[in-house]
């Protein structure tokens, strides 16, 4: 059966605390942190973008699988912050890992679930024997306008999953999707920062799609919440995923491992990849996982996974928790500099 052969993650080593952002705008940092359940967020360095993060995560996945680029037949990168409007991220990743030229590659977009759409595509081409292994990547360096609510949570990071049929560490037993035309969040071509529907992003958008997709996935698998050891959903803030998990019937011990947003913010396309990576870092053979992605616009992808004996043979050092523990706090001035929020005027 097809599934995850290996995985890798990457989180930038800088972070800014919610209180620091709030102090710049004369807001109550404690209130913002409590309301969002986000206390700090990752910040990419000036030399980091979706490409560099994708390469780092992919190299870790390749290292764990003890593979080289010749084993990879497809690379698909999902993101809403690709550095180029016309120039694929995936071809650069392919070159960096030595996978060119005998492979297929493409960049995916579907807001925060672009990466899980890439997983589904890899499952398809691996399943019909077009390629032996494909890499699905979910990474973002998300944007939040200065002073906007998004600035408190929009962060950076992501992961890569090698999908194949040999030496699988977690089988993907079932996958399904729930998709509608729901304009909860958008950014037009040329706009630097996205716009959102405020409270409209909750009940009719995130919750409707995640809840329906979660129920559909469990119906397809013939499972119940108590059949799973772990659950991870998309994490636009620290409260929505907890509410969604509880509404679906899950308990804290099932969702707490994959819940990273309170410490690193919303990594958009990277959220499910990082949450799932944190789970795989500690999972045991036989553990069962439910993963539910969400992307604005809107849709959800659901996955039912079972961890195999193969995971015990994998080197799982360089964990997500290791990456979080090494993060260093920066101030708002440094954050603004790194994120290009400073208007330098006419440089001439």
Place the predicted regions along the sequence by residue.
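Flexible, glycine-rich active-site loops centered on histidine and acidic residues
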Residues: 127-159
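Buried hydrophobic positions in well-ordered alpha/beta secondary-structure cores of metabolic enzymes
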Residues: 4-6, 61, 72-75, 93, ...
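Short coil/turn connectors at secondary-structure junctions
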Residues: 1-2, 69-73, 100-103, 128-134, ...
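Short glycine-rich or small-residue beta-strand-to-loop segments that form or flank ligand, phosphate
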Residues: 73-81, 107, 231-232
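Acidic, glycine-rich active-site loops and adjacent beta-strand->loop/helix elements
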Residues: 10, 78-83, 110-115, 138-143, ...
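Phosphate/pyrophosphate-binding loops at sites that engage ATP/ADP/AMP, CoA/4′-phosphopantetheine
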Residues: 57-73, 211-227, 248, 282-283
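Conserved catalytic cysteine-centered active-site region
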Residues: 30-51, 80-133, 243-275
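Condensing-enzyme catalytic core mediating Claisen C-C bond formation in acyl metabolism
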Residues: 1-47, 148-204, 208, 294-297, ...
């Amino acid at each position: 059966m097809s599934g995850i052969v290996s995985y890798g993650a990457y989180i930038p080593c800088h972070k800014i605390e919610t209180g620091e952002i709030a102090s710049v705008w004369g807001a109550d940092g404690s209130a913002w942190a409590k309301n969002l359940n986000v206390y700090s967020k990752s910040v990419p360095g000036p030399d980091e973008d979706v490409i560099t993060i994708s390469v780092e995560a992919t190299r870790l996945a390749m290292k764990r699988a003890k593979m080289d680029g010749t084993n990879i037949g497809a690379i698909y990168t999902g993101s809403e912050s690709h550095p180029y409007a016309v120039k694929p991220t995936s071809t650069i990743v392919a070159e960096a890992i030595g996978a060119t030229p005998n492979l297929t590659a493409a960049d995916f977009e579907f807001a925060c679930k672009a990466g899980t759409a890439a997983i589904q595509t890899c499952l398809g081409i691996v399943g019909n024997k077009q390629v032996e292994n494909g890499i699905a990547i979910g990474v973002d360096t998300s944007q939040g306008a200065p002073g906007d609510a998004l600035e408190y949570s929009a962060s950076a990071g992501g992961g890569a999953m090698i999908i194949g049929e040999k030496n699988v560490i977690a089988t993907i037993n079932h996958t399904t999707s729930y998709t509608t035309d729901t304009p909860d969040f958008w950014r037009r071509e040329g706009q630097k920062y996205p716009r959102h529907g405020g409270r409209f992003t909750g009940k009719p958008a995130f919750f409707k799609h995640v809840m329906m997709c979660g129920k559909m996935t469990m119906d397809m698998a013939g499972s119940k919440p108590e059949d799973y050891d772990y659950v991870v959903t998309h994490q636009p803030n620290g409260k929505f995923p907890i509410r969604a998990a509880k509404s679906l019937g899950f308990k804290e011990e099932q969702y707490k491992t994959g819940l990273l947003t309170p410490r690193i913010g919303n990594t958009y396309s990277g959220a499910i990849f990082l949450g799932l990576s944190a789970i795989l870092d500690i999972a045991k053979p036989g553990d069962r996982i439910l993963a539910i992605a969400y992307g604005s616009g809107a849709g959800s992808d659901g996955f039912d996974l079972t961890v195999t004996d193969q995971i015990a043979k994998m080197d799982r050092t360089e964990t997500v928790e290791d990456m979080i523990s090494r993060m260093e706090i920066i101030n708002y001035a440094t954050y603004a500099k790194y994120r290009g929020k400073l208007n330098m005027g006419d440089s001439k």
